[in-house]
Amino acid sequence: MSKNVSRNCLGSMEDIKKVFQRFDKNNDGKISIDELKDVIGALSPNASQEETKAMMKEFDLDGNGFIDLDEFVALFQISDQSSNNSAIRDLKEAFDLYDLDRNGRISANELHSVMKNLGEKCSIQDCQRMINKVDSDGDGCVDFEEFKKMMMINGSA
């Protein structure tokens, strides 16, 4: 796989590696179905076993039962309009995981709740500061357009 990722929704290759390493709990260089289940469970407690299996099947490009770094990177590559549309849908799905009350905006409380479920140690004040960094309309929340801009900040959309 090419190391030259022209655009991706997480930013730099280093950012993608950090996310991968966070998911790869046992540091074996691959994400197992159990590791994927833990991540999905933290983000969406009502996700079914079938949804987790379907996600693994979709992301496990070589069919070996694991998601390796190259497969993980491939998820974030955006190279043409059709994959850009897919990336926008993926971003919307990610946004929806944070938008717990489904009002189209992520509040500091929602961000804090999700971060806590992921095992992140951050205060509500930390979450408010994160929100403020990308809140371009000053409403104290992040809407989808602000979320999209934040996620694509290191790439040219």
Swiss-Prot record:
One Pfam family recorded for the sequence: EF-hand_7
Superkingdom, natural source: Eukaryota
Molecular functions per Gene Ontology: calcium ion binding
Amino acids binding Ca(2+) 1: D24, N26, D28, K30, E35
Residues annotated for Ca(2+) 3 binding in this entry: D99, D101, N103, R105, E110
Alphabetically ordered keywords of this record: Calcium, Metal-binding, Repeat
Record: residues binding Ca(2+) 4: D135, D137, D139, C141, E146
GO terms for biological process, alphabetical: regulation of flower development; regulation of nitric oxide metabolic process
InterPro entries noted in UniProt: EF-hand-dom_pair (IPR011992), EF_Hand_1_Ca_BS (IPR018247), EF_hand_dom (IPR002048), EF_hand_pair_protein_CML-like (IPR039647)
EF-hand domain span: 11-46, 47-82, 86-121, 122-157
Sites where the protein binds Ca(2+) 2: D60, D62, N64, E71
Function (record text): Potential calcium sensor.
Protein name: Probable calcium-binding protein CML23
Originating species: Arabidopsis thaliana
